[in-house]
């Protein structure tokens, strides 16, 4: 027989889902069913919480305590960059492997780096900024009209100043 369910125990479940959509509740069921939650209700709550991230793949952190689920959106660097591009949401079923050919400012990159700082492995903010610039390169957008890798080279050579914190 399984151990008795402790009401004060906190369980954390991470899920990848598309923002603003009720994902497949069948994928939720094996993860949160044993914890005494209704997958359908949690799926609707996730869709509500991720409304701002329509059409983007994001990670959702479910903190479950005493049969209550708290939903926290944990956006990836690429999701933050694509959101900063302010492109209209696309139907992801029609188009696959989209290149985002937009342009964002270096200040927005710094803001994204500050948001991601706690999850970054870099020692300083300049390292995190370089990580975000690398992600911007993979997404396919430009920064201040230039290729992101050129800006990384400028940071390394000292031509571009990074904020200290």
From Swiss-Prot:
Subcellular localization, as worded in the UniProt entry = Cytoplasm
Q: Which residues form a coiled coil?
A: none
Task: List the SMART domains hit by this protein, alphabetically.
Answer: RL11
Modification type Phosphoserine: residues: 38, 165
Indicate what this protein is called per its UniProt record: Large ribosomal subunit protein uL11
User: From what superkingdom does this record's organism come?
Assistant: Eukaryota
The modified positions for N6-acetyllysine read 54
Q: Which organism is it from?
A: Homo sapiens (Human)
State the organism's lineage. Eukaryota, Metazoa, Chordata, Craniata, Vertebrata
């Amino acid at each position: 027989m399984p151990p008795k369910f402790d009401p004060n125990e906190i369980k954390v479940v991470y899920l990848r889902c598309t923002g603003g959509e009720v994902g497949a509740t069948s994928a939720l069921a094996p993860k949160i069913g044993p914890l005494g939650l209704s997958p359908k209700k949690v799926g609707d709550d996730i869709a509500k919480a991720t409304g701002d991230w329509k059409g983007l793949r994001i990670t959702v952190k479910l903190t479950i305590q005493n049969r209550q689920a708290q939903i926290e959106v944990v956006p990836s660097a690429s999701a933050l960059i694509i959101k900063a591009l302010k492109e209209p949401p696309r139907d992801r079923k029609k188009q696959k492997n989209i290149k985002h050919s937009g342009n964002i400012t270096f200040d927005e990159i710094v803001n994204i780096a500050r948001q991601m700082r706690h999850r970054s492995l870099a020692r300083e903010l300049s390292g995190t900024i370089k990580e975000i610039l690398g992600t911007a390169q993979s997404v396919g957008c430009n920064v201040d009209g230039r290729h992101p890798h050129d800006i990384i080279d400028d940071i390394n050579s000292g031509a571009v100043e990074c904020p200290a914190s």
